[in-house]
Amino acid sequence: MFEMRYVYLFAICIKFVSSSELGKINNLLQGRLIYTDNSVATNVLESKFPFLKSTCVKDALKLFLPQCIANGLESIDAETRVETAIKLSICEFQASGLGEIPENCMVDDLGSMMDCMFELESSSQWWTTYSGNYQRLSSICYENLLPFEKEQILKLFLNITELYDSFGDDVDTKLNHLMFQMEQDSQNFLDDLARMFRNYDNELRNATESNRIILENDLSFFRNKVNDVLYETSEQLEVQIIEKNSQLMNEVDTVHHIMSDLADELAKNDIKSKINDLKDDSLNNLQDLVEMSNDVKEYYSRNNKLVNTELENFSMGLKKQLGGMSKDLSESQMEAIELLQGFNSILHDSLLPSMTDEIVPEMTNFKNTLLQEWTAITSTLNGDFALWNEEIFSTFNDISEKLNGTKKKLDDIEIRVSLVHKNVMTMMRVLDFMWKTSKMIIRCGYLAVKNKYYWLLCSVVWIWSKYRTSRVNVKMIPIKRYYQWAALLLSIYLGAKTGSLIDF
């Protein structure tokens, strides 16, 4: 990450110092090689480089020496030679302490120089000095070649140093402007990114709130519907149980009356007809009970199917809504990821190649200096980028936590729906168990009524309860009672053997 930012900054800086800037720098360098500019302190340079000190001989050779070294002595015109020889002669006169110097030779003018020559001819000493200097111009040219080259090299170095100084100032200005522009662009990008995430968060909140309201309404409607169905079922079951209980009590009373009548008939010896009538009535009543039990069973089966259908429809609807919400959430996450990937691809595929292609070979020599100057800048940028990364990561973590909270709420709703379904199924199993128990009791009663031994046992119990006495003395029972008991036992035995008395 650090290397990518470093290359990115280096490419941006190099972009601003590209072809047009290099052309300006080349022109400026050529101009400084031709036209000298003493921008460095003269005293310091003359103390470090004595050959730079201004002397009379140096001033005299100022025009002659560059042309002679560059193009040779033959390229110099006669006027320049004469002027140079005159100036060298004047320098010798001044160095020797000669008091009388021609006045026309002290003026730097072509007409004065001609007058100066006429005056030099007037004195043999002056003319000899002038003639010797004129003849030594070729040797003077080669004798001053090395000092002249040193001076030119030093001037070139000073020009390059000044060029580097101005280039550094330009680079600092460009970097400051670039940093300011980058900060503005980064701030605008962060503002746009924060605005985008706020809009995304608001949309996600609104969608979650609307889905939560829809789910709550559906759950409330289903709960009310289930409560209504259960309430109606419980009321109908209670009414039917009360009816069955009353019918059972009536049947018990009827059986009790029948048993009383049977006892009376037994006393009157009219048993067979009463038993047959009782049998027919009991069969009819049991058939009615069986039909009613079948009706109740069909009613509960219909209610059970209705409740199961409602639960299945609600479960399917809830699964579809949860699937739609999960799909929307996944699509939103994919859009955010595609946006970040698009920004990353734009950065790596468009910006970096276009900037790195403009790096010119001439800037390679400046890389080490720029690296040292940019170390402090990169450290500051690293802190800023780290802070931006932390803010972006914290925003993503908040969004992930909110999504996890929404998922937990949906899981809680699903658990509650499963608990409601479980409670309804438990209630249905309890009702089914009650129905099976009541059916078994009715079946046992029906089988008991049909069994001849049950009637025999009831008859014995009834007779025993009717004729029992505390501590009966056998001797006190009359003989008539023995005959009656014997007749009763004989009839019971014969009925059990032949099946003619109690038969279906």
From Swiss-Prot:
Residues 1-19 form the signal peptide. Glycans are attached at N159, N206, N313, N404. GO terms for cellular component: endoplasmic reticulum membrane; mitochondrion; nuclear membrane. The keyword Nucleus applies. It is found in: Endoplasmic reticulum membrane; Nucleus membrane. The chain crosses the membrane at residues 453-470, 482-502. It is a multi-pass membrane protein. InterPro entries: Nuclear_fusion_Kar5. The keyword S-adenosyl-L-methionine does not apply. Induction: By mating pheromone. Expression is directly controlled by STE12 as cells respond to mating pheromone. Residues 20-452, 503-504 are lumenal. One of its GO terms (biological process) is karyogamy involved in conjugation with cellular fusion. Coiled coil: none annotated. Required for nuclear membrane fusion during karyogamy. Belongs to the KAR5 family. Interacts with PRM3. This is Nuclear fusion protein KAR5. The lineage of its organism: Eukaryota, Fungi, Dikarya, Ascomycota, Saccharomycotina. The gene is KAR5.
